[in-house]
């Protein structure tokens, strides 16, 4: 799905910071279940502060996330935004972005794409995306003979040749 993060653009901060919010939630809940109240309280405060900072930095009052970046919409909906008016605005803008621009999600966000569209009341759009045969799309990969989901939407070109971009392996700098 292109360089591990995004299909057409790289905006790491909203994606990585959404994971920080998620991690703080998991850690605070884990501490609570383990009976470590002081730790749970500390991580809950960090979670609240980080969530607030994320929303202030990446989500406009009109519900635009990270300059209208699809993966950021997904990560904000999945890990950051609580129920409420702002979340509903974000859902609407997310669906509108996909209708306007087509599929542009990256590796970390794509797994959450279809369920979040369904949650937003966009089941038909979710099915349209799932079944689209062009690149980017899952059916494109199947038509090209894929038996698993590729790391890049366009790992194989329509003519059957491999997209030549270097892999991000740690040995690249040795070649």
Description of each model-found segment:
Residues 1-175:
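Active-site core of glycosidic bond-cleaving carbohydrate-active enzymes
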